[in-house]
Swiss-Prot record:
This is 3-deoxy-D-manno-octulosonic acid kinase. GO terms for biological process: lipopolysaccharide core region biosynthetic process. It comes from Mannheimia succiniciproducens (strain KCTC 0769BP / MBEL55E). It is found in: Cell inner membrane. The lineage of its organism: Bacteria, Pseudomonadati, Pseudomonadota, Gammaproteobacteria, Pasteurellales. The keyword Membrane applies. The gene is kdkA.
């Protein structure tokens, strides 16, 4: 792990030695100039997909942190600064690294960037592994049913996360990815912004109910194939 400061910019990298141009790794135009941009996705902002297998061992996704909701129309990307460890990018990087090292299927974090601004504010970016050849469940389920075993796999994955006392505060069908290849199915969890460790057990049931509501919402919105039998299978995997 390497932490570097350059003027008002702070960097955290998942490698041990300085690399050429590392302070530019969080600038999309740096990658565009090298013809390494291989795609993008729109959300609150643009997530850029980068061909970086030769540099980091994985292709990557570059994301700038933006605010949502009404407040985001006034202040799109500035956050109050208290400490580096509590910034959005450093916190998500460190959590992903902890989960990745524990063997959970999450994106490998590659780098985090914080730009300190006037009046004790900051902007932030995250560079992490792009999980390729996958779909999120809302893209798959309108046309495909999951088996009971696959729903149980999802339940087991969430249980592994909860057993580490990690609460995914935005656990929903969009943040579960699936890859099906050669009769093998694997699931990933993504988007750990504002997530973290939480003591006790009461919150775990609430977290599961959040996911349940997400599936029910997508039944109406995206017409996904989901039933209470599927949910029972997921819970069976979680409990066993």
């Amino acid at each position: 792990m390497l932490q570097v400061q350059h003027e008002n910019h702070f960097f955290l990298f998942n490698f041990d030695e300085n690399r050429p141009n590392q302070e530019h790794f969080f600038e999309s135009y740096f990658w565009q100039k090298q013809n390494r941009i291989i795609g993008s996705a729109k959300g609150r902002g643009t997530t850029w997909f980068i061909q970086s297998q030769d540099l980091f061992g994985v292709n990557t996704a570059l994301r700038h942190y933006y605010r949502g909701g009404l407040w985001g129309k006034i202040n799109k990307d500035r956050y109050a600064f208290s400490s580096l460890e509590e910034t959005r990018s450093f916190a998500e990087f460190n959590l992903l690294n902890r989960l990745y090292q524990a063997g959970l299927p999450v994106p490998k974090p590659i780098g985090a960037h914080v730009e300190k601004l006037a009046f004790n504010h900051y902007r932030a970016d995250l560079l992490s592994e792009r999980i390729e050849n996958t779909q999120d469940l809302t893209a798959l389920l309108p046309n495909t049913e999951l088996t009971a075993e696959q729903w149980q796999q999802i339940g087991k994955l969430i249980r592994r996360l909860h057993d580490l006392q990690i609460c995914h505060t935005d656990l929903n069908a969009h943040n579960i990815l699936i890859r099906q290849q050669n009769n093998d199915t694997k699931f990933w969890l993504i988007d750990f912004d504002k997530c973290g460790e939480k003591p006790g057990n009461l919150w775990k049931q609430e977290n599961l109910q959040r996911l349940h509501r997400s599936f029910l919402k997508e039944v109406k919105r995206m017409r996904i194939q989901f039933s209470e039998k599927n949910w029972a299978d997921l819970l069976n995997g979680y409990q066993n």
